[in-house]
Amino acid sequence: MNLSLIRSMTRSAVFELENGLCYRPAHPFTVTLNGKTVYEACQTNVFSLFSLLPGTEYTVGVQAEGESLTCTFTTEAETFFVDASRYGLVADGTTDNTLKLQAALSTCPKGGTVYVPAGRYRTCSLFLKSNTTLYLEKGAVLLGDNDRTHYPILPGVIPSENEVDEYYLTGWEGNPLSSFAGLLNITQVHDVVVTGEGTLDCDAENGDWWVTPKIKRIAWRPRAVAAVDSENICLHGITVQNSYSWTIHPIFVKHLDLLNFNINNPYNAPNTDGIDPESCEHIRIIGVNIHVGDDCIAMKASKVFLGMKLKKSCEHTVIRNCLLDKGHGGIVIGSEMSGGVKDMVVTQCLMDHTDRGLRVKTRRGRGNTAVIDGLVFRNVEMRGVKAPFVINMFYFCDPDGHGPYVQCRDAMPVDEYTPKLGSLTMEDIVATDAQFAGCYFDGLPEQPIERVSMKNVTITFDPNAEAGQAAMADNRPLVKKLAIYAENVKEIDLHNVKIEGYEGERLHFANVGHFEED
């Protein structure tokens, strides 16, 4: 067992207890800072320290299971400390503080920190700048404006003078469509940190954001945090809740750290995904606690227009020690993935009563740049997940999703609009109280799934399981306690895969090529 520093910032730091367990340690542990107790009973593998001093050396200690572990670190330097309350903030939860907060953010010198003290600050869209830190003190709440007419509209596409080049400023569900600016906007900047123990509360339930959510009114709905075309971005420690739509939505971001923070949206709030990186590179999602009304983490890469034009995949992703709770899917790939999703490793995550666990969703029409490959899921625990493993290449999204082109079960010509699924590896996974299906792999007949490898996987069904839809595709029967279903897969390797409590035959295969089991 080791104690490691994930990242230090100017006034905060985040650490990880390397114990090989999913999200939580076997027993609570004590955390000290320079010999003084900070947490008496820490119950998560990833933890953070706040209210530190910049440019200062500290020693953090952990007493865990009879072991004493220490880690010495130095916080980042800070040039200036900007107290936003000096800009005339009114912390009554009603007064509009948008211009005052924006003034603090805009005038912060390079290398400085904008500090927001405890209080409830009503605000509309805020825009962060390069080389700055936004620190939300414990008890500080940035409360979103309820009136959509107060929000700026960001055009999806900005044309150039030569009328050839285009700049993509925002998007909606994979297309460059005009949308309202988010509560926090990180646009074309670099080296930005948002940290602290405060809260971003979009307050969407008290507006009209969740009413007729699929209808565009003025512009498409905003995100809680929207980041576009930026580099070296970090979100840490805060709580983000009651989002208008997707909660954290980075597009074309390189080197993105999402560390040890909370996302809370009501389960019935429409399209309130937790984290949706779109065509991003070098992503770390570590120690995040997500409770949402849609997919918890969904890796995306645009729809066919941007995906095939820009060919920007979502790649080099690490997801570790996260709690994924009660969403539609735990870890999801797609369905907007026309640029491709590659090289993702998920470890030590706990999925608790999500509808599906590891979920891949795509369809004809995403394009031949829509390649999913190099996905590894290892050391994951699922509790009460209805369908632990789902790969669905007939996903019925978009206006034509129920049409014959998407849903036809006969082989169609492989062309420039045909997506491809490569290699998926699943190892050392335990899923208890499943309901619909343990494994449901549904590839295209003209472009079968290349390879599925499972090793040391145990799935146990809930004795009181109810039937349901394992994959969102037409003409698929409701299933209950279905062990392994696979259709149109080139290769399946099962090594020490145990399924308990299933009904009927264990294997339901159609058009499966090489199959190996031991």
Regions found by a protein language model. Name each.
Residues 1-518:
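Extracellular/periplasmic carbohydrate-active domains that bind, remodel
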